[in-house]
């Protein structure tokens, strides 16, 4: 599905330039906290305020949001600051309550976008409603599932749609809370070029010191906007305190961003080169991981007096990867060469 008639997420009074910025606390905690954050962000010329009213937590027992009462606080934000307000919805009831309260923009979280049943319920609840809706990527790196979630909303008649890249869960321990895997949103942009694409550096990084570099990387990749968690006293936040920044820090970060024009004639070449660089980074990380596992296998063989080279297993690897290469349109000889080089040292022979 091409979705050629998607519309920009433009709200009156917001300049149509990059980056579109949505900011506010992870959670609406108290009326005073919400209003303080909104006033501080409005003073920094942020136009769209975000706050979680319902918080889907990974485990029970954590703060799960203030619920409907928080929508009244968002109404006060609109009335007192003139900002647009946004929140996350995960059920039909959430949609009903948010629309009734006059929320201007909705987003759908990673746990919800991963569930086709939940997405269909939300699509039904939003049918006939003209409101911007942003869809976060599913928790797992599944581009088709992400596109499918967007398609369900599109099929319900929504045209002001966008996507939020918030990274992907992984068992591997790295500096990120959620792995960026930039090639996935890049492929989403290639498949749906008219779909606005925002980055959530707070959830990707999981640490406030990573928000600025991740935001710059998103701008370098041509993302249209940022959704950032900002709290007046982040160390006292009731949820995700490590990944929130103060409004002043956010303002400084936004002013130091380098936003390059995407209409330059060299932009396609630069974007392709950036894609190659990031794919190379991921390939090297995967190769390093594979080598670590290979060394563990080699050590096991040594401890159990097993031969380092097991020809049958080695032939199986080369034959299987060669067949996969053909299916993917890759020269199988290049794959064989890569495997031979990867197994040059005895401990790498798996």
Task: Say what each PLM segment does.
Residues 56-103, 116-117:
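N-terminal active-site wall of soluble small-molecule enzyme domains
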Residues 61-71, 111-127, 142-148, 178-183, ...:
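Active-site-adjacent beta->alpha loops and helix N-cap segments on the catalytic face
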Residues 64-84, 125-130, 186-194, 245-260:
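Alpha-helix-loop-beta-strand connector modules within alpha/beta enzyme cores
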Residues 50-68, 232-238, 298-304:
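Glycine-rich, proline-tolerant flexible connector loops at the mouths of alpha/beta enzymes
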Residues 129-230:
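Catalytic alpha/beta core domains of metabolic enzymes, predominantly
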Residues 338-347:
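Conserved small/polar residues in nucleotide/adenosyl-binding loops
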Residues 1-22:
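N-terminal amphipathic alpha-helix/helix-capping segment at the start of soluble metabolic enzymes
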């Amino acid at each position: 599905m091409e979705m050629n008639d998607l519309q920009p997420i433009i709200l009156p009074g917001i300049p149509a330039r990059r980056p579109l910025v949505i900011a506010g606390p992870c959670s609406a905690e108290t009326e005073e906290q919400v209003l303080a954050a909104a006033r501080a962000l409005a003073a920094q010329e942020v136009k769209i305020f975000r706050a979680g009213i319902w918080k889907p937590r990974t485990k029970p027992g954590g703060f799960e949001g203030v619920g409907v009462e928080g929508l009244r606080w968002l109404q006060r934000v609109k009335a007192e600051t003139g900002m647009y307000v946004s929140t996350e919805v995960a059920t039909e009831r959430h949609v009903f309550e948010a629309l009734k309260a006059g929320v201007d923009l909705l987003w759908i979280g990673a746990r919800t976008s991963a569930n086709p049943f939940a997405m269909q319920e939300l699509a039904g609840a939003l049918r006939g409603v003209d409101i911007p809706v942003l869809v976060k990527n599913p928790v797992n790196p599944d581009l088709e599932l992400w596109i499918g979630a967007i398609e369900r909303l599109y099929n319900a008649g929504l045209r002001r749609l966008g996507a939020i890249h918030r990274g992907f869960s992984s068992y591997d321990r790295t500096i990120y809370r959620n792995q960026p895997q930039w090639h996935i949103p890049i492929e989403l942009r290639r498949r749906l070029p008219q779909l606005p694409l925002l980055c959530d550096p707070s959830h990707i990084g999981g640490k406030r010191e990573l928000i600025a570099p991740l935001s710059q990387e998103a701008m370098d990749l041509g993302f249209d906007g940022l959704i950032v968690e900002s709290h007046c006293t982040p160390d006292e936040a009731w949820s995700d305190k490590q990944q929130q920044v103060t409004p002043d820090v956010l303002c400084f970060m936004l002013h130091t961003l380098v936003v390059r024009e995407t209409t330059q004639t060299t932009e396609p070449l630069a974007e392709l080169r950036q894609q190659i660089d990031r794919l190379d980074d991921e390939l090297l990380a995967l190769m390093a991981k594979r080598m670590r596992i290979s060394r563990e296998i080699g050590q096991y063989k040594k401890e159990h007096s097993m031969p380092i080279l097991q020809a049958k297993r080695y032939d199986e690897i080369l034959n299987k990867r060669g067949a996969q290469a053909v299916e993917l349109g890759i020269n199988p000889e290049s794959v064989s060469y890569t495997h031979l080089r990867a197994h040059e040292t005895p401990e790498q022979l798996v």
